[in-house]
A protein has these predicted regions:
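Cytosolic C-terminal regulatory domains/tails of membrane transporters and channels
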Residues: 430-539
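Hydrophobic alpha-helical transmembrane segments in multi-pass membrane proteins
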Residues: 39, 93, 97-285, 347-392
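Divalent metal-coordination and catalytic microenvironments
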Residues: 10, 89, 117, 168, ...
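Short acidic-glycine loop/turn motifs at beta-strand connectors
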Residues: 43, 407-412, 460, 519-520
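Membrane-interface amphipathic/re-entrant loop segments adjacent to transmembrane helices
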Residues: 47-61, 107, 272-291, 295, ...
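Membrane-interface segments at or immediately adjacent to transmembrane helices
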Residues: 7-9, 389-456
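Short amphipathic alpha-helical coupling elements at transmembrane boundaries
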Residues: 72, 88-91, 103, 183-187, ...
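Membrane-interface helix/helix-cap signal primarily in integral membrane proteins
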Residues: 4-112, 488-501, 505-538
């Protein structure tokens, strides 16, 4: 017996499905995380003895407790403004970051700072490697007889392993860790460290343990960035050949140009996948990274490494203060960039299959040579052309029969039945349409003709009836194009005799919420819980 589990009275329900078609699916994520349900407690927890706990479970829970305890210690010793960010960068616990800081970093194109990935792993493990190399090189008898880079690579690998465990081992962190280990192995074996073969091995190992990560935004963006950087810098290195010794001014210019190229290449490689998943573009991302990355690279992460080294000795206060000062500068940069006009552009969602086509285009552009590379760029351009012609949904019908639709004349106005209901689903619908700042009004106040039994209004030339009682369904079916019954089922007779599109409790229970597209007089209903999803084990 290594731990005490706890018993608690709670109300638990199955993980919910997507609230919009092709939207984020919490049930799928919960399935692969082995989470059977979500809920909330209705009583105080009680400790119980559990004798069936495995060694691996003991280790996992102990590590979680250690991480959260360390996060609390770091927050207590850090400046108040940046304490949450410092805990997130050192332990992966992001729940203490204020929302306004997250929003500012996202708008400035610096959200990647929050996710522990290749940048963080490279700086921390690489910093450990170079520091170990320097210290070992100072030992003259050792450096004269042996290649000190190899034991330094082992130290770097150990530092990377410790950071992986400490940070929570997300998929992006695992990818970065695998790449770091491959690089250190290459140093030990006197091989080329950075190559597309290394990227492919890292991808295969990641997918071997987490095959579900293939369609996740973290996997796609992290591998897109590292693959593009490897290709660009490998070709740059091969073409420039011998580089003569240069002075400080030339070195400064070379460093600035390298930082610019790195930010541009990584940003360009990941932009398509980021927009596909998040439906927004940070217009000043390149400038934000040019201003912020020197602070993060040369101040924040070295101080973070020093803080981790000093933690066992209780000497972390000074490194954490330096780290906090650097992060405060970075936050000032992000807030400054976020206030520029047009800093964020919201775009509407693309069809789900576009991401597969864009992935193929990216592979051709990075792995191909000559004509195949140009074919990849052309295919990417085709993806964006198709995307630009994709229609927005005209109306949303939640799984409880709540309706939201755009004004026929002004798409900046969204009409709803009740402002307080279906908030999350409505936000996802607005984000999918690329109109997150739309004004919300009640259709009962302006457009609809309502009585005790139903509300009737027009959307893009089609008559819609929101019915509150099954007895009214036959009458509304004769005059409306879409009939929505908010309570109970319509019954088999009414369903067969209805010429309109009829949605009732039976449809909502099976197919969930719906997006409605009206194009050239035709009505298309797209359910959130599609037939293909209903056949999945997490449905």
């Amino acid at each position: 017996m290594c731990i005490r589990d706890r018993s608690i009275r709670a109300i638990i329900s199955a993980p919910p499905g997507p609230v919009v078609p092709d939207g984020y699916d919490p049930a799928r994520r919960a399935y692969f995380q082995q989470i059977g349900g979500y809920g909330f407690a209705i009583g105080a927890p009680e400790s119980i003895e559990v004798k069936t706990t495995t060694i691996s479970e003991c280790y996992r829970r102990g590590l979680v407790r250690f991480r959260y305890g360390l996060a609390s210690r770091i927050r207590a010793k850090s400046p108040e403004q940046t304490a949450g960010l410092q805990a997130a960068l050192l332990t992966g616990v992001r729940s203490y970051i204020p929302q306004e800081q997250t929003d500012a970093l996202r708008v400035a194109g610096l959200a990647h700072v929050l996710a522990i990935s290749g940048l963080h792993m490279g700086l921390l493990a690489g910093g450990s490697y170079f520091m170990a190399t320097l210290l070992l090189a100072m030992i003259a008898p050792l450096s004269r007889r042996y290649d000190v880079r190899k034991p330094a690579a082992i130290i770097g690998a150990l530092a990377a392993t410790g950071y992986l465990l400490l940070s929570g081992a997300s998929v992006a962190t695992q990818r970065a860790y695998i790449m770091a280990i491959i690089v250190f192995l290459a140093v030990i074996l006197d091989r080329r460290a950075f190559s597309m073969r290394s990227v492919a091995v890292a991808a295969l190992i990641t997918l071997m343990f987490h095959p579900e990560a293939l369609i996740s935004v973290g996997f796609q963006m992290s591998f897109a960035a590292v693959a593009a950087l490897v290709v660009v810098y490998r070709e740059w290195h091969d073409k420039r050949g011998y580089v003569p010794r240069i002075g400080f001014r030339q070195k400064s210019w070379s460093w600035l140009s390298t930082l610019t190229v790195t930010s541009f290449v990584a940003g360009t490689a990941t932009s398509g996948f980021a927009v596909l998943h998040f439906h927004r573009v940070a217009n000043y991302s390149l400038l934000g990274n040019l201003f912020a990355m020197p602070i993060f690279t040369f101040l924040v992460m070295p101080a973070a490494l020093a803080a981790l080294i000093a933690l066992p000795f209780g000497l972390e206060a000074i490194p954490l203060a330096v780290m906090g000062w650097g992060l405060s500068l970075l936050l000032k940069v992000s807030v400054w960039v976020a206030t520029w006009p047009g800093a964020i552009l919201h775009v509407w969602a693309a069809p789900a299959w576009i991401i597969g086509l864009l992935g193929l285009a990216f592979l051709l552009a990075t792995l191909g040579q000559g004509l195949r590379r140009y074919l990849g760029f052309g295919l990417a351009a085709l993806c964006f052309m198709i995307w630009s012609q994709t229609p927005r949904p005209d109306m949303r019908i939640s799984d409880a029969g709540q309706v939201a639709f755009w004004d026929n004349k002004d798409e900046a106005i969204l009409y709803v039945g009740r402002k307080r209901s279906d908030r999350y689903g409505r936000e996802q619908f607005m984000q999918k349409a690329g109109l997150v700042n739309g004004e919300i009004k009640r259709y009962q106040d302006e457009l609809a003709q309502c009585d005790k039994l139903a509300c009737r209004f027009e959307v893009r030339g089609k008559q819609v009836s929101v019915v509150h009682h099954p007895s009214e369904v036959p009458l509304e079916c004769d005059t409306a194009d879409i009939v929505i019954l908010t309570k109970r089922q319509a019954g088999p007779v009414a369903r067969r005799g209805c010429a309109a599109k009829l949605l009732d409790e039976r449809v909502f229970r099976t197919a969930g919420a719906h997006d409605v597209y009206i194009e050239d007089g035709a009505i298309e209903l797209r359910p959130a819980n599609k037939k293909g999803r209903r056949e999945r084990p997490w449905s």
